[in-house]
Amino acid sequence: MLSVDYENFDLISYLYNLVRQIPDGMVSTYGDLAEALGDPVAARSVGFMLSINKEPDYIPCYKVVPHDGSVGNYTHPLGSAEKMRRLIRDGITITNGHISNFEKVRFREFKTDYPLRKLRELQFKIGRLYDDRNDYSLDTIAAFDVSYKETRGYASKVVYNKGKIGAYVYSSDSMFPYIPGYLAFKEFKFIRALYDNETMILIDGNGILHPRFAGLATHAGVSLKTASIGIAKHLINCTVKGSDLLISGVVAGKMIGHHTIVSPGNRINVEEAGRLIEQREGKEMRSLLRLAHNLTRLHIETNGNIARYDFSTRNTAIQSS
């Protein structure tokens, strides 16, 4: 379903190339750069990507300012004072911490392919491929969790198979930051790397409960051609009617209790996913996600050098993929 190019897309470098287009004597805003990436929702993520810029003399992030024309912060030992010095050096006038004639020196004419637009188009396609037939088996259940330390991603998979539990870990760099609605492009590559033909996969995230009906669990289930369920802890922007969660008038998820949000990823419908997770087997499935989360934290703490993990009564060897 997805090409390797999309799975490993380096959005950070793409942004840095946009920043390098800003001429001396001009500035752009975080929102301007988000628009150039293809979605204004990425503005906060633009700030994060600029904050980890390790080459400030090559990538002139001092030319990026808040939307109100204030100078703003600068990740430099001298802070905003150094940012003002560089802007003044470029010929920009600053008065009381704000750029004079802001709109006249504001640059928006980026040469861009709007990559986030293309990713949204792909999500619409994936959403349309969601299969709501209850075509699933619980023979092998895999729960996935991914966490990050700067741009390094640490993933874990806990598998339940015929009464036995296995655990696997994988780590890799991720050059795609968190952007609301685009989590799959940050995390799916980790799930693909660990996936081994399990018949049901559980994802810490949403399925069709997503603006384009293509959350991480749907992205993974459709791409891997397997059944999947998304289990999340935080509610996205949707309509709540009792236990039903609606996107654009369509029931796309269920609220189980006060803290569990369930949405089908693939090969299962909303009602069946909610029923399955609410019953006894579902509680056991949720425990697999908790184990995967704990394993991921340990994976990070050991900088990817984990050798063993004790599941209370089980001393389970970890296989690193």
From Swiss-Prot:
GO terms for cellular component: cytoplasm. The active site is at 61. Residues 1-86 are annotated as: Probable methylated-DNA--protein-cysteine methyltransferase. Its EC number is 2.1.1.-, 3.1.21.7. GO terms for biological process: DNA repair; methylation. Mg(2+) binds at residues 145, 204. Residues 87-318 are annotated as: Endonuclease V. It is found in: Cytoplasm. GO terms for molecular function: deoxyribonuclease V activity; metal ion binding; methyltransferase activity; RNA endonuclease activity, producing 5'-phosphomonoesters; single-stranded RNA binding. Its cofactor is Mg(2+). The record marks 178 as: Interaction with target DNA. It holds the Pfam family Endonuclease_5. Keywords: Cytoplasm, DNA damage, DNA repair, Endonuclease, Hydrolase, Magnesium, Metal-binding, Methyltransferase, Multifunctional enzyme, Nuclease, Transferase. Its main location: cytoplasm. It catalyses: Endonucleolytic cleavage at apurinic or apyrimidinic sites to products with a 5'-phosphate. DNA repair enzyme involved in the repair of deaminated bases. Selectively cleaves double-stranded DNA at the second phosphodiester bond 3' to a deoxyinosine leaving behind the intact lesion on the nicked DNA. In the N-terminal section; belongs to the MGMT family. This is Bifunctional methyltransferase/endonuclease. It comes from Thermoplasma volcanium (strain ATCC 51530 / DSM 4299 / JCM 9571 / NBRC 15438 / GSS1). The lineage of its organism: Archaea, Methanobacteriati, Thermoplasmatota, Thermoplasmata, Thermoplasmatales.
